[in-house]
């Protein structure tokens, strides 16, 4: 029996070492350790062994089985290693090869226009200040001398969150917050998103951007306002640009004006771009109303100031000759990659 076990073990180990595929290895496992395998048959014949020899023979059979199982597992792991190495070699990526470049975005016209405007005003000593887009009714209207019965407060024009909280319709509330801090003098601009209940078309959107400006100091006059906006227009549209102030009305400024610039396409001669007038409207402005100063805790007898507001999209549309505001929000790369 001992001799038979040794022969079976040596033959099995020899076949295991010579095997070159997993299928061959599995076949060896079945032939020697399966239900009808040679080693299993020896185990079944234990009934024919003398009782006193059974423990010894049983031990030898178990040792042979353990030896074969260990050899089979070791060979299986070797096959697995070879397969993994072959797979890794087949899937190897040459990192030195030139990669496909990802699609790059482009700077948005609004971003370019905002950075240009900020550069101009910061160069004149202005500070850039931001404020909340969700605002109290008081800061959006009453603190700006817009009474409770003013048409602008109508729900058809304003997005209300509650009866006294709304989406700001202008960035002017930022000016009020700054004035309430009482740190004078003030020289600031407040760029940001605003919201109005407008239908979407070529020139309107329910969400757009404004840049509001404010200067508060002693002895500020309308001449300071004119000089500031004239310089802004020249830096934005060119040194030959002229400005024209037309009387207007805003609740928070007195006197108030709308500002036109000479058409930078035709030099003021009249063309399709300026609709033949030679002038293009760009912003509204005026001297800060004394009541607005009072409500923010500033003495209008000692301090005066001016304010102005310009639509950021308006600047982008003019500078880049875009005829439809909706193009700014459609995220069409064919359009945006031009900038």
Curated annotation (Swiss-Prot):
Domain of life: Bacteria
Keywords: Aminoacyl-tRNA synthetase, ATP-binding, Cytoplasm, Ligase, Magnesium, Metal-binding, Nucleotide-binding, Protein biosynthesis
Entry note: cofactor: Binds 2 magnesium ions per tetramer.
GO CC annotations on file: cytoplasm
One GO-annotated biological process of the protein: phenylalanyl-tRNA aminoacylation
Binding site for Mg(2+): 254
InterPro entries the UniProt entry points to: aa-tRNA-synth_II (IPR006195), aa-tRNA-synth_II/BPL/LPL (IPR045864), Phe-tRNA-synth_IIc_asu (IPR004529), Phe-tRNA_ligase_II_N (IPR004188), Phe_tRNA_ligase_alpha1_bac (IPR022911), Phenylalanyl-tRNA_Synthase (IPR002319), tRNA-bd_arm (IPR010978)
Predominant cellular place of this UniProt entry's protein: cytoplasm
EC number in record: 6.1.1.20
Molecular-function GO terms, alphabetical: ATP binding; catalytic activity, acting on a protein; magnesium ion binding; phenylalanine-tRNA ligase activity; transferase activity; tRNA binding
Xref: CDD domains: PheRS_alpha_core
Catalytic activity reported: tRNA(Phe) + L-phenylalanine + ATP = L-phenylalanyl-tRNA(Phe) + AMP + diphosphate + H(+)
SUPFAM superfamilies associated with the record: Class II aaRS and biotin synthetases, tRNA-binding arm
Pfam family, one: Phe_tRNA-synt_N
Location within or outside the cell: Cytoplasm
Necessary cofactors: Mg(2+)
HAMAP family hit by this protein: Phe_tRNA_synth_alpha1
NCBIfam families: pheS
Protein family according to the UniProt entry: Belongs to the class-II aminoacyl-tRNA synthetase family. Phe-tRNA synthetase alpha subunit type 1 subfamily.
Assembly, per entry: Tetramer of two alpha and two beta subunits.
Identification of the protein by name: Phenylalanine--tRNA ligase alpha subunit
Organism, scientific name: Lachnoclostridium phytofermentans (strain ATCC 700394 / DSM 18823 / ISDg)
